[in-house]
Amino acid sequence: MAVHRELVSAGKFDEKFRRALLDYYGYGYKPLASYDNWRRLNGILADYLDWAEEPGAVRFASADSEQMEENPFHRVYRFCKYKPVAYPATFLHTLALLSGEFSLRALPAAVQEDEERQMHLEDVLAAGGPFKTADLLALIGAGEARTLNNRLDDLATLGILVCEQQSGSRGGAGNRYWRRGQLTLAELVRCGEAVDVDFAQHLQTFLQFYGETLPCGVLGTFLLDRLGETGARPFRFKHAYFMQALHDFTAVDLLAAMEQGLWCRVVYRHGTSNLETELLCWPLELRRSTMQGRSHLLFYEPEHRSLASLRLEFIDAVYLYEDAVVRDGLGREAAELDADIARAQAMLPYVWGSSTGRTQAHNAAASPALQEVALCIRCDAKEEPYIARRLLRESRDGSVTFDERAGTATLRVTVCDAKEMRPWLRSFYGRILSCEGLEDVLAEDVAAMAAGHPQQERASGGERWQLSPELRARLGAGTQARTHEQLFNEVFSVYYQIMAEVFCGLSAEEDAAFCTEAELDARIRAALGAHYLKLGSETEHTLPQELVQTLLGGDLVERGSVTRRAAQRCVFKGEAQTVAALRSCYQCAPGLRFYRDVVPLSVLELRWLAAALADKRRACFLSDAETRALQALLVEKCPQLAPLALEKIVHIDRFHFPAEALAREQQVLPQILAALAQGRDLALCYRTRFAGRRCGRYTPLVLVYSLRDDRFQGRFCADNGEIVTLNLARIESVQLDAPSVGRAQAAEQATALRQAEWRAVTVQFADVRNLADRILTEFSPWQKRCSFDAEAGRYTLTLAYQQRDVWDITVRLMGYGAGIRFTDPAHEIAREVARRVREQARLFGE
């Protein structure tokens, strides 16, 4: 049996994947250890990340996220370990029998020896079910009923199968009957194509976009796997925190707890300090930062009556408790506990990021002590509209007013912890006239930056609590959350997909004859080639052997022989030979695709799809008629199914995008997508930043979406040969034009232009609490190099960036204040930061 070094069991996901990737990709440094993890991750992600071993035993993984067509960490979910032979064989047998798309060539020999059983099974097969567990066991021909029941239960939990339990004649449990789940992707596509013949293309772009931008987007990639992508992906994603896809493993458990009204015991281990603790909590909300890359769970903690937060990526395990069990264990008045939770929920709009107050203990026991912040900056809304727009889009829950006569803008916001705003406020240094509530803090900060003195910021709040042993004993162990097993599951692995494809090919009617070992190997190699972008470095070596063992050991094929003419130097002298051969035990129609036509959509896939169909941007990809048809189909087939509660995952620092700009994008985006898919140019008119108008013929190259900015830009080649970037919301009109000529050349020109715009900046920072974690997480989407001098306790980080992003990099680095030092004070970013700090010091001195 092949050794699966690139596969990881669901129980080891955190240890083998998430934490190792946090070290290699997020932090960018790792001492010599865990070589197996390094090799495993390199094998899975080598095509996407720049893996390098630096002198001094530093390992490093880096990437430019804007150059990636897809999230590389979604690949991790396709390498879930399974029990060889037995599990994939049972999966293929069961779906083939229940689907109605396959027919058995002959009943198993053991069945044919029992005439009564044979007649019963022939009737069941002719009627297409229902199938009892005993029926499936007899037809599959291997294993025990208990083992098969357990495996069928696993598939039922996914939603791929449905179990109907009958009552026994004496009141006990009777037979269990099995049928296939509610809806396949093929049915979904047929529903859409009844509305629009191009629906499959529309659905593909819909899934390509939402698979990269919605939480739990890996479910969208599973749907794309089923659909089968064609053509190049039209999207790129600017400074995307792809790493957050690994947090979905824990997020789905917490979402399930919130939906079901369950308490959680969270086992938590900090990634940098390695502090281990466990807490009891009532989960309230998940927060993701589009600016800094970190994710948090906000929750109510009952022992300290507190609204608090934890980094989502540092949660190792979640255990669930019924509400009544926790209330009994706490021994508190129900009204008091309910009031605490209500106050904690009401505080959420006042949490700027993740800090819930300067003091966390008992902050939910009474009305919270909120802080009023009034930021007044120098801003001429007419002469500097970009500053006005920035303040409006980044104000979160605050209100902004402008005084045109004074040339100022004022943001008023109420928060739990005003100090948490400090990194964002630094980006306005050089303009701040006053900041009520933080004036002394900012004045000290500016003085430290001007003097170049390193400054360690203390995290707000930060109490370290532990679930008391007494309460832990009263509550018991709880039930381990397992919703993540529906996300990281072998059914979605690339191994299963290739096995299913080969199985369908062997079963197709036009290929009903026996095939030799060499012919089977050719089929396997063809399937590997079709999935080559999904393979790990070891897949093509380990899978062929295992696939043959699955087919034979799982009774999916029957042995036989076939006559073939032996290969000779002279084809006329080849002699006929009888050689061993195999044939599928099933028959199916040619062209059948197992995951599209046979395997029903899982519960999580359906719920995620329902949530995506309700998103505000879906009209960019699907017409109203297409959306209504899909929503009606979901209601018809799955009436009890609710959309996945993605509204509980909040992108806290996402910019406000004007409704009228979104409406413009919805009007022009379908035309641009059609041009990209059909290889055509566009005739468009564009409103420039300074109220000008530009019209012409443009060749679309790629669409770039920023989750932080919540907007699309397009890269085009203009009719004069210039490579331009246009905001889609500024396009006034667009029409499909003639077929593109020279698109490949224009794409090469755009790539060369991007290469010419690379710049780099190097900063250093001390090994102080959480600073390395914050900086390296925020800059994880950029290509970078990081090293650590243990003797000096100092990190050196070199960031690569595009010249057009120099302002963005400047603002981000300013957020760390005196915590960082530029190695080259003459660098343009260092000079700009110094200029702003000097100007701010002058303003505070007036």
What function would you assign to each model-found segment?
Residues 3, 7-18, 30, 223-375, ...:
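Core beta-strand-centered patch of the WYL/Sm-like small regulatory domain
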Residues 4-37, 42-50, 91-123, 127-133, ...:
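Bulky hydrophobic/aromatic content
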Residues 7-12, 22-26, 337-523, 560-565, ...:
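Polybasic (Lys/Arg-rich)
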Residues 21-82, 460-478:
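Long, low-complexity, charged/polar intrinsically disordered regions in eukaryotic proteins
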Residues 57-65, 164-176:
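Short, Lys/Arg-rich nucleic-acid/phosphate-binding segment
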Residues 72-91, 485-490:
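Basic, short loop/linker segments at the boundary and entry of helix-turn-helix/winged-helix-like folds
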Residues 138:
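Alpha-helical residues within the helix-turn-helix
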